[in-house]
Amino acid sequence: MADVVLPGRSYAEKEGTFSNTERRVQRIRKAVEIEGETREDIWIFTEIMNRMGYPQPHLTSAQVMDEVASVTPSFAGISHARLDSEEVAGRGLQWPCTAKDHPGTPIMHVGKFSRGLGLCN
């Protein structure tokens, strides 16, 4: 029996984003309302931090995405609002996406590796 049970939700029960293996960041939206004591992952992580003595406010998934974009240059052009816009229309954005008007990067390392340590043919 577990000492601690974290009452997480499935993807269909929460809001947020996910990144797939082609670096595409897409929105997920709550499809069903649930009853009971389950919580979104971000709520669980924040509660663990608070209980360990690292006080943090409870943020929405949009606020977390905005913070990620503010500290991670390759995500600087990604936000919930942009992912929800007609411009993106459910396709998502592929990082690096370095500015609010950047279209995303479908192919990385064209011709060479970003650090110049190898060669792509």
Regions found by a protein language model. Give the residues of each.
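Long, low-complexity segments enriched in small/aliphatic residues
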Residues: 65-121
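Non-catalytic alpha/beta scaffold blocks inside enzyme catalytic domains
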Residues: 1-77
